[in-house]
Every structure is written in C-alpha cells, then in structure tokens.
Amino acid sequence: MSTAPALPPLPGAPGGPALPSVEELLADAVAVAVPMRVRFRGTDLRHALLLRGPAGWAEFSPFPEYGPHECAAWLAAAIEAGWQGWPGPVRQTVPVNATVPAVAADDVEAVLARYGDGITAVKVKVAEHGPEGGLVPGSREADLARVRRVRALLPHAQVRVDANAGWTPAEAVDVLTALADVGLEYAEQPVPGITDLAEVRAELRARGVPTPIAADEAVRKAEDPLAVAAAGAADLIVVKV
C-alpha cells in the first residue's frame, strides 16, 4: 500500500470518468510475474501490474531498463485503457503478412498453405541460432534456399526477411548480396545495434544492392528513431503496437 498522501483524481476525457487517485489505483492492483517459455531481451520472467478500472483490466509492464519518464508514459496508457476505454474501431479487417519460420525449403509450401489463397506479403525468418548461441551449421545455405522457395511459390508477393539481429555485418552483407536477385521488400534488423545497421546499409549501397534496411530491435525508446535517422542506419522502422 502506498504511503503517499491522497491526491485528487485527475480529470478524465470530456464526458468520461475521472482518472483515479494513487490510492484507487493500488486498491485493486495485482502484481504478477509470468515465467516466459523463451528468454527475451535478457529476461525469462515478465513482471506486470494489472489495474482494474471501470472500463476493464489494464496492464502496466515496462521493460526493466526503462527510466521513470518512459515508465510514466506506459502507466498513463494503462490508466487510460482501464478508466476511459479504447476508441471505437475504424475498420473491421487489417491485412497481415504470412510468416515462414526457419524451416527447410521443402517445408515452405506446407507452411504457406496454412494461410490460404491471396497471400500478398511474406516475412521469412533467417539467421537461426542454436540453443548455445551462434548460427546453426549450414544456416546460410538454408536461408538462401528458404527465401528462394518462397519467391518461386509466390512470384508476385512482397518478400521480406527478418534476422532478429542474428548476423554480423559481414554475414548480413554476404547473404543479402546473394539474395539481391530475389527482390526483397526489405531486410528487418539484420544485425544488432544502430552502428552495425548503418555499416550494413552503406556496404550494400556500395555494392549496388538495393535492399532496404528496416530497424526493429534497435528502436525501443522514443529517441531511438532519431538516432537511427541521424546515423543513416535504416530506410524504415518496424513498429510494434
């Protein structure tokens, strides 16, 4: 229970409920720690605070490295969801891409068949790592075969690859150069870090490889897109919502 003095509720949206005081927030809050099946961003236990408001449950679960000003924005979003609710939908359907995991090329057709007809975009996972870290043996050849199989099956679809920061700059340049004839829509986070992304992007341009570079894991905080742009590290950013 908080020892902070009672604070008056903040005004809510016009016509909506007032936002809660600290005491009201904590009265029905539930702290949880959920074990993760796969370690992600250095953690295998996800901590969260569940808040119960008049519009429903909300979740406050910033990553551990986030500072107070970043956590404040996350908390404000959680309170807004729980006390004011979500806005009404503006559309009934949203197009999504098919995803091909790091499977053998012979299995690609079966994976794509699960999505039915009309596939217009495919994300292909590449740079598979083993349980002990490091690329699995033969991953380069497997990646090339997998991507080429997707292109052969879907000659008119947009094809993008996602390495989840699994390559070194040299490995990324090597594989993306080899895939230049596939006509990739973009390569998502081929290497870790903004500096490495900028290096890969510059080397591909020097070689005449037109594949755009997308930043994903390198963008986690509000100022990161500016750093990516300043370094010339990417052509686009993948935003998780």
Where is each model-derived feature located?
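A structural signal for the main folded, soluble domain(s) of proteins
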Residues: V111-A113
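Generic structural signal for residues positioned in beta-strands
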Residues: D28-V30, L50, P95-N97
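Residue-level signal for beta-strand positions within conserved beta-sheet cores that form or flank
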Residues: A27, Q92, V209
